[in-house]
Amino acid sequence: MITVAAPEAQPQVAAAVDEAPPEAVTVFRSKLPDIDIPSHLPLHEYCFARAAELPDAPCLIAAATGRTYTFAETRLLCRRAAAALHRLGVGHGDRVMVLLQNCVEFAVAFFAASFLGAVTTAANPFCTPQEIHKQFKASGVKLILTQSVYVDKLRQHEAFPRIDACTVGDDTLTVITIDDDEATPEGCLPFWDLIADADEGSVPEVAISPDDPVALPFSSGTTGLPKGVVLTHRSVVSGVAQQVDGENPNLHMGAGDVALCVLPLFHIFSLNSVLLCAVRAGAAVALMPRFEMGAMLGAIERWRVTVAAVVPPLVLALAKNPFVERHDLSSIRIVLSGAAPLGKELEDALRARLPQAIFGQGYGMTEAGPVLSMCPAFAKEPTPAKSGSCGTVVRNAELKVVDPDTGFSLGRNLPGEICIRGPQIMKGYLNDPEATAATIDVEGWLHTGDIGYVDDDDEVFIVDRVKELIKFKGFQVPPAELESLLIAHPSIADAAVVPQKDDVAGEVPVAFVVRAADSDITEESIKEFISKQVVFYKRLHKVHFIHAIPKSASGKILRRELRAKLAAC
């Protein structure tokens, strides 16, 4: 059972900032009118609401193979998958881990779990066995859906239960593999055989509350180690509706549109703003397992992609790679950039390459459900947005800016910490009431840890980050995680990790290390030590040796001093 303590039951931990007096609070809202959100519906029912009127329209496209599933076929597959999972003992409140790159099976499994009232926690298949196990254990996973090539990761970590298809128990693990072109690994179950044998009529009728969890992504929040973010049916439905519902949707797409899904679905931006928004709107989703420039350009051209969700490294590739000119990308009408800020130079370069497309940015974080603001130029009745703007706050939500030191509300054009309140924000962190109370205050405001301001036209601009997270190509790299690994090395006395600007990745993690007495440990040995324990984007790009880590009187690492050292190099 996933539980999150109610605010009144949570320990009295100080919020990220103190609240300003109510009469002094300046609240910013969307330029678009609020809408009726059917948040009483379970997520699968909400997303497939148009399936009956679009039965033969394309829904999911496996871009690499060309296999296309209509809305009718997709919904049927999801129900059969739900029946198969139910037969394996998955029920209301159970957690299912999806350890996959983007594929049709990922989407089907996510919706199948929703039909059963179960919860999906998606993990990055490129993570190390140790990292996967941490998420597995924290989530209380009952079953894993993966690909044969990743099964060895589950066998390599001794703390994983034994994989066994015949026995269900606390000391065994049920693993389903999606491959249909090779032998199923020993002890695993073949996904498509389970689907073929399933009866969609056997899916149980489950009483699902809007406050039941449906997704459990992991995020490092504003500080610290990765934590499970509890997103309910209400919060996810609300987050999708804020983007694509209403007479003038903020992100306008529908039948006939094709959304490119090349960003990983284990990232909330892709799951929410691409897959779920497209299905709800009646658009097709072209699923690509990974980013490869030639394959992506070919998919855009072949499937006539109209909506492309990207992150800054993809924008850089589209803007600068000469291969782009060999492909017809004229079908693209919307380019939505998220996950990390984007510079004006890149914006201008992309506009020169795709002059017919509307380009804009959104701003979000996993805990916020995830979108806080979106470019108003994407709306059905568009209004222009400034360069560098993250758009205006989403509908049915409130945004305020507070002084990070005093907590008092700030007016327009004054930078401070961005806070958001609305039905889309998380229920809380999994089994972590202290972190929840430190992020969501007693009035329901979620403190993002990002510094920004709202201008005279209600547009949101992000200018800095209070939180310590490093953003490598849009992926989160929590310094605390790397620091704990570094300090565990017997030849390292102390360590700190900070971001360094990078033209391609945005930011890369760099370590400052204090050697232990009599140690002569080298940079290469430290980098190798870390690379064996973390996913590729968390690997250290540089190690600097210093005599002491600068810290405050309370022992907090003075990261600004270390960043200044990097800038001076």
Swiss-Prot record:
Protein EC: 6.2.1.12, 6.2.1.34
GO molecular function: (E)-caffeate-CoA ligase activity; 4-coumarate-CoA ligase activity; ATP binding; trans-cinnamate-CoA ligase activity; trans-feruloyl-CoA synthase activity
UniProt note on tissues of expression: Expressed in roots, stems, leaf blades, leaf sheaths and spikelets.
Annotated binding of (E)-4-coumaroyl-AMP, by residue: F269, S273, A339, Q361, G362, T366, M374, K467, K471
Record has Oxidoreductase as a keyword: no
Cofactor(s) required, per the database record: Mg(2+)
SBD1: annotated span: 292-361
Keywords, ordered alphabetically: ATP-binding, Ligase, Magnesium, Nucleotide-binding, Phenylpropanoid metabolism
UniProt: CoA binding residues: R290, K473, G474
Residues reported in the UniProt entry to bind ATP: S219, S220, G221, T222, T223, K227, Q361, G362, T366, D450, R465, K556
Biological processes annotated in GO: phenylpropanoid metabolic process
Family the UniProt entry places it in: Belongs to the ATP-dependent AMP-binding enzyme family.
Name of the molecule in the record: 4-coumarate--CoA ligase 2
Source organism (scientific name): Oryza sativa subsp. japonica
The encoding gene: 4CL2
